[in-house]
Amino acid sequence: MSLQMRVGLGQFNELTDEKLIFIKQMGCDDFLMNTPKLPGDKQWEYEDLAGYKARADAAELRLMALENVPTTFYDKIMLGQEGREEQLQHMINTVRNMGKAGIPILGYHWNPNSVWRTPEPATLRGGARGTRFT
């Protein structure tokens, strides 16, 4: 897949009809999901990933990336703990399932405490909600 850099939308974890419409309204064809709410406590299965991809395709959008898996998928790997080999195999399965489903990019963080940020969106100028740094 040889695609030029484009603007896409993301940073949501549920794929709703409203979000798919919003992506189109914003003039984008691409989107990513951040730690999507998919079933699985060790890995993501092909069928679930393919379902998300099919919804994107039906909306004439490209699901280009999933950013972050649950930390419990790879915390033992990050910390070098017993069970890391099993987690590594599940991560390999997740990546393969993503590829099979046609989702080309997996972004991840390498922080066992999760991503650091302010815990809740704050009310900003004009009533907008967003991250506030104090």
Model-identified regions with their sequence ranges:
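N-terminal pre-domain/capping segments
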Residues: 1-134
